[in-house]
């Protein structure tokens, strides 16, 4: 494998892995504040899935000869990055729905082509990740739908979250 290609793969896969791990944080803050036990279980499962996605991707990058410790050190030192969408605060419960529906939806659009990328370990990880992200996207949609069918305050909260997240999500493309 050409050295430049290997370096680019490590950079891309590690950034993707970092994004999956850091992506747990905004929604993870809401696990203890979920309005029902069912919503808590759904959110807990989603956050666990995102952690698993990060681990799949770190494992794919490790096949290229870099260690997980090196990748994490690069993140901590600022040499490596993660998706900036995860820097936006989650101010209310509706943000969890918008993240699932729109952020995960945008991620799916960007990630499905990676299922056919030229590096096998990454492509195989992406097949599983995209299937799980599709489930997360549906959960977010259903959460927003429930809010939009709720009280006037719930509808307003859903609209406010959608308005706040719209442009950051569009910037994912």
Predicted regions and their residues:
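Helix-loop segments that flank and shape redox-cofactor active sites
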Residues: 2-5, 23-45, 106-122
